[in-house]
């Protein structure tokens, strides 16, 4: 029987030649089980309402513009997936540094108190297409401040300097 949904730990390997599923029961358990939905619905709706605040929107835009301009100005960094003209609209940045392994960079950033996603992002064929073994993904949320954005960029610069 073939799973009707995909994602998360239910897949062992994805390639152009096919997909290998995890053994049972994981094969049919795509993603994380959503047992927190009911008690978290009210706070989620409150956060959505809060995100309409013009000051918060301005702060998000400022953070995103700063992070994008800082990453794109660094010749050591290769950014993926940010179409031209949308720089201030995204808050998720996928990137790699030529000559630096993504896991090494993620470990150093972790020691600096920065959480990033490292790996193939469940997209092995895309990594092959880009000619990379993996990348990092940094995400920013409405609660992130300019101070945190500056700390991320300065820490990333320091971590790259340690590895190059």
PLM features: what roles do these ranges have?
Residues 1-164:
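Pyridoxal 5′-phosphate
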